């Protein structure tokens, strides 16, 4: 337990700030800045084998013990990408502190780069992060996928609390947590990241995201990945993102969304991904949300999803172009609509046949 306080200033990060169980890391609001160092990147000189704890690179410049490193090839994306710390060097061969998660083959364009989450927590519980500004320096870094990285990234980090942080300009996601139950994210801003603003995923149960802002991210503001269930998402602002304001899909059931505002996103303010019956995001409830001036239908419901509830939401488009409030596609099951205010050129476009209503 205990608290680590980080004073005012800018800190250049060559590896993650690694969270520990039941420890609070606290910065000074708006004045403690963690900046990602520019990345080095090299092709592998020889194959990295699954389970191996070293890599050999063509160009060792910029790689050194103590640096964070990611290793992948074109078949080893997602969770098959390895993120580790370099712990030793012999010429252009580097020892790492974790085994490789996949074969990374030279013939498949295997690479290593000094990219990593700037703040990370793995296999912990009860950690807390407060009042950090995290600068991803995306112009000087190669991408790291959201299954393994973000400005703040958690993996099996149960009960972690993130409060008052800014996550910006990362070449990937802003704040992401995977297989991490009972995570709370409050009063945070995720902006100008290359991909997602907030990314709860991979079976993260009972998340809470409250009073947060996601803006100008390259893809979605809030992306519920796979099996995000029994979550609470309230009083958030999702604006001017490059794809959807909110995206929900694979087995993301039984969540409550209330008093969120989704506006000026390139595509729909709320999007249900196209999932078959067993994998669809059933029984989600939306109360007192606002969706306005987004691209496409304000709310687009796809797939074989059942038992969605929309109560007292404001859905509007104040522009001159044709607009649709709610688009319900042909395979969607029951949708309950109650006391919603829909101010679009076409309020509801329902493509279902009688047997799907």
Please give the residue ranges for each predicted region.
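Ser/Thr/Gly-rich low-complexity blocks that favor extended beta-strand/coil architectures
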Residues: 56-101, 112
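A generic structural motif
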Residues: 87-90, 133, 319
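Glycine- and charge-enriched low-complexity intrinsically disordered segments
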Residues: 102-130
């Amino acid at each position: 337990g205990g608290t680590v306080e980080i004073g005012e200033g800018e800190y250049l990060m060559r590896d993650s700030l690694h969270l520990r169980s039941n420890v609070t890391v606290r910065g000074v609001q708006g004045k403690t800045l963690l900046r990602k160092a520019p990345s080095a990147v090299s092709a592998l000189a020889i194959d990295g084998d699954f389970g191996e704890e070293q890599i050999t690179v063509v160009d060792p410049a910029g790689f050194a013990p103590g640096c964070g490193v990611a290793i992948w090839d074109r078949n080893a994306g997602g969770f098959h990408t390895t993120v580790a710390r370099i712990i030793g060097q012999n010429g252009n061969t580097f020892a790492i502190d974790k085994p490789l998660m996949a074969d990374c083959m030279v013939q498949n364009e295997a690479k290593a780069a000094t990219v990593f989450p700037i703040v990370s927590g793995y296999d912990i519980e009860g950690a807390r992060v407060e009042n950090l500004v995290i600068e991803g320096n995306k112009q000087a870094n190669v991408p790291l996928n959201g299954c393994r990285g973000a400005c703040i990234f958690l993996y099996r980090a149960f009960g972690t609390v993130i409060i008052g942080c800014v996550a910006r300009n990362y070449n990937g996601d802003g704040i992401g947590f995977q297989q991490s139950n009972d995570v709370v994210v409050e009063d945070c801003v995720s902006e100008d990241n290359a991909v997602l603003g907030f990314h709860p995923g991979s079976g993260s149960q009972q998340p809470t995201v409250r009073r947060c802002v996601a803006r100008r991210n390259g893809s979605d503001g809030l992306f519920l990945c796979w099996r995000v269930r029994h979550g609470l998402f309230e009083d958030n602002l999702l604006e001017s993102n490059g794809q959807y304001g909110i995206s929900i899909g694979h087995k993301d059931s039984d969540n409550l969304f209330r008093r969120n505002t989704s506006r000026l996103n390139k595509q729909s303010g709320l999007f249900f991904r196209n999932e078959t019956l067993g994998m669809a995001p059933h029984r989600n409830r939306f109360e007192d949300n606002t969706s306005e001036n987004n691209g496409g239908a304000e709310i687009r419901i796809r797939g074989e999803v059942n038992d969605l509830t929309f109560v007292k939401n404001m859905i509007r488009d104040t522009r001159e172009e044709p607009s649709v409030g709610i688009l319900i596609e042909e395979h969607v099951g029951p949708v309950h609509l109650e006391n919603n205010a829909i101010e679009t050129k076409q309020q509801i476009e329902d493509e279902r046949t009688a047997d799907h209503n």
